[in-house]
């Protein structure tokens, strides 16, 4: 079996190094698990439609029969199918997301494999009595009824063209296609499924889109997830600003979700206007915004602050003026790269060399750059297995239902209770701060959670306040977080829309720009190469002034070919040895 995998090396190496398996995004992964009752209940299929995966009640019956009454040869497939079914549940997600390689385990995508294993074992079950075979076959056939309309249609005497045109008009997609010059963001939480993506990009007057069917596999999937999350939290300034970063001159929003998330249309409208988007059209369900741009354009941006680490996106959503970067490793950045920012946030960062990382933070702080460190995300020391950085040690603590009152330099804070599902809160407080700006009492002890170390430009905070704020939008905690950095949640990065000329050729993209450091709004991929200087930030490709020719080639070709060649050689050797042993 190992040799078989090696034979696939030319494909496998590229797949494991890039693409969907390189993504580390729990929000994307969570979309591929669901309630077991939905998975096996045919009535849920009839009432909810086709937005959920359906395993089949009949398939479950076949599994039970096979496990209980099948013999060894056929039972294996039934057991395998049952295990895969259990692994698709929300409960399994809570475990699988913590495992190494969890980015491979989007379990609902394995349902088809499970069904094939079950059917194969059913066919191999040659000892099963014919009446039972007939009964199970009839049950399997009947179980297709909830999904029958996918094959035969609705039988409502309306042609596909009429139905699609009506759907385009009712959702304002046709209006959006008319005004869109470069790209459209359809923000409806994919309620239309793949149909919505098809109506935008392949029907009528098709235009490019930011969202799409199978967007989980996109290189910009984290950007898309953050847009949806910010919209749910009411962070409309972030939404429109990042739509601009992604090259969306049109944004089409389903208004139902404003009410669902207790957000207001007035706040949405105000944020759109701040970024230059104007309302073009609206109906009872959708509202369309558009900003005037050249036909093909990019963005030159300037951020006052940068966030590094797995928690960078949460900071950026609270403070849109904060840039997120691709690597969480602090050792990947130089002093010169970070010294141009006023603030550097570290949240869930890593390092290869602790001493070098600490030295970088100290140099930045002495140069006047404020470094805000969220202590919950400080890496564990490899020798002591403790969370320690710059002489400050993180000590674990658990709260239940809510934080205690917090005494801070902006006054006493009385935070909201923990939200449902997070009533047990594991976090850290701090030992070793030079100046203490925040304390709380627990079990009669006065404990520190907020202050400075080494100098006033290095600020540390514990208690996982950023994550708490992302869940609750607690006003007092938001004020404290803003006070730490001096950045307002209303502040935006400086952006300038600039014209670009983009031409697509045979396995190449030619980009002509009149400016340096231009975000092309095109997703960056590891198949890109160029003799010119191209870079990538926040999953997007940047070019400089002049003409840049980007070549597209098969990634990791030689490494993959080497693995495949080794697989062929080892397979031949194994076959020769096996043949000699048989003789």
Residue positions per predicted region:
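Membrane-embedded transmembrane-helix bundle of lipid-linked glycan/lipid transferases
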Residues: 1-159, 171, 250, 279-282, ...
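Extracytoplasmic/lumenal acceptor-recognition loop(s) of multi-pass membrane glycoenzymes
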Residues: 142-145, 150-154, 176-249, 257, ...
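Membrane-embedded, lumen/periplasm-facing catalytic core of multi-pass transferases
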Residues: 161-185
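Extracytoplasmic/secreted cell-surface and envelope-processing proteins
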Residues: 193-196, 259-267, 352-358, 373-374, ...
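Catalytic cores of secreted or luminal carbohydrate-active enzymes
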Residues: 244, 259-260, 268-271, 285-288, ...
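Active-site-proximal, structured, solvent-exposed surfaces of multi-pass membrane proteins
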Residues: 304-311, 490-583
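A glycine-rich, often tryptophan-bearing local segment used as a flexible ligand/cofactor-contacting loop or short
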Residues: 355-414
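Catalytic beta-strand/loop cores that center a nucleophilic Ser/Cys/Thr
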Residues: 402-454, 469, 523
């Amino acid at each position: 079996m190992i040799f078989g995998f090696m034979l696939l090396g030319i494909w496998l190496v590229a797949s494991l190094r890039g693409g969907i398996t390189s993504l580390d995004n729990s929000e994307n992964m969570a979309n591929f698990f669901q309630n077991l009752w939905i998975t096996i209940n045919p009535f849920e299929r009839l009432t909810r439609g086709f937005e959920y995966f359906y395993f089949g009640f009949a398939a479950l019956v076949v599994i039970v029969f096979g496990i209980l009454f099948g013999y060894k040869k056929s039972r294996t497939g039934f057991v395998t199918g049952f295990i895969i079914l259990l692994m698709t549940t929300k409960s399994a997600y809570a475990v699988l997301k913590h495992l190494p390689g969890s980015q491979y385990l989007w379990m609902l995508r394995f349902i088809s494999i499970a069904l094939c294993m079950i059917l194969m074992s059913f066919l191999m079950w040659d000892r099963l009595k014919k009446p039972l075979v007939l009964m199970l076959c009839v049950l399997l056939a009947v179980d297709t009824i909830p999904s029958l309309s996918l094959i035969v249609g609705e039988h409502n005497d309306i042609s596909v063209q009429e139905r699609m045109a009506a759907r385009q008009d009712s959702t304002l997609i046709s209006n959006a296609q008319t005004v869109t010059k470069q790209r459209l963001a359809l923000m409806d939480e994919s309620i239309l499924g793949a149909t919505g993506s098809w109506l935008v990009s392949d029907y009528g007057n098709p235009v490019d889109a930011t969202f799409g069917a199978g967007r989980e596999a996109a290189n910009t999937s984290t950007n898309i997830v953050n847009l949806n999350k910010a919209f749910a939290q009411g962070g409309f300034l972030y939404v429109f600003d990042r739509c601009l970063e992604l090259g969306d001159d049109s944004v089409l929003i389903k208004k139902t979700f404003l009410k669902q998330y207790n957000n207001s249309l007035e706040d949405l409208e105000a944020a759109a206007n701040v970024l230059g988007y104007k309302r073009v059209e609206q109906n009872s369900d959708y509202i369309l915004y558009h900003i005037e741009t050249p036909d093909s354009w990019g963005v030159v941006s300037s951020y006052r602050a940068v966030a590094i680490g797995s928690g960078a996106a949460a900071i950026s959503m609270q403070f849109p003026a904060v840039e997120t970067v691709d690597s969480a490793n602090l050792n990947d950045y130089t002093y010169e790269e970070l010294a141009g920012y006023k603030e550097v946030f570290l949240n869930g960062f890593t390092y290869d060399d602790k001493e070098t990382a600490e030295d970088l933070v100290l140099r930045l702080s002495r140069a006047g750059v404020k470094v805000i460190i969220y202590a919950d995300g400080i890496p564990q020391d490899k020798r002591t297995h403790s969370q320690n950085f710059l002489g400050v040690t993180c000590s674990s603590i658990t709260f239940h239902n809510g934080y205690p009152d917090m005494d801070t330099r902006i006054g006493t804070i009385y935070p909201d209770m923990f939200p449902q599902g997070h009533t047990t809160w594991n976090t850290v407080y701090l030992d070793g701060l030079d100046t203490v700006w925040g304390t709380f009492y627990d079990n009669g002890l006065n404990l520190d959670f907020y202050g400075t170390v080494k100098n006033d430009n290095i600020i540390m905070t514990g208690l996982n306040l950023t994550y708490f704020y992302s869940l609750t939008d607690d006003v007092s905690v938001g004020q404290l977080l803003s006070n730490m950095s001096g950045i307002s949640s209303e502040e935006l990065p400086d952006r300038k829309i600039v014209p670009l000329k983009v031409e697509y050729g045979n396995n190449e993209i030619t980009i002509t720009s009149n400016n340096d450091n231009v975000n092309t709004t095109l997703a960056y991929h590891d198949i890109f190469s160029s003799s010119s200087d191209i870079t990538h930030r926040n999953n997007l490709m940047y070019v400089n002034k002049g003409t840049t020719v980007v070549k597209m080639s098969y990634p990791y070709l030689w490494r993959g070919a080497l693995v495949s060649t080794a697989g062929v050689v080892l397979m031949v050797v194994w076959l020769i040895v096996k043949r000699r042993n048989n003789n």
